[in-house]
Amino acid sequence: MSMIPGERRYQDGQRVRHRTFGEGVVVSSKLTRDDEEVTVAFPDRGVRKLMASLAGLEVRDQPGV
């Protein structure tokens, strides 16, 4: 999925899955110059800061759904 410039793809509270770290919850995300920095809390791996373009995160659900 391509990202629209200036728009965050990940929202606080969103459940995601990472191929190495497993399932986690987005704590925060912020746009950088040309990417999105996503902070995710993984139950067994701690809190990780990931660059969206490299992380390969799979969205599991939307917050509030």
Model-derived segments and their meaning:
Residues 48-65:
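Intrinsically disordered, low-complexity, charged/polar segments
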Residues 22-30:
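Short beta-strand-centered aromatic/proline hotspots
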Residues 21, 43-45:
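Glycine-centered tight beta-turn/hairpin loop motif at sheet-sheet or coil-to-beta transitions
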Residues 15-23:
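Short coil-to-beta-strand transition motifs
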Residues 33-39:
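Short aromatic-glycine-enriched beta-strand elements
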Residues 1-15, 63-64:
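Mixed-charge, Lys/Arg-rich low-complexity intrinsically disordered regions
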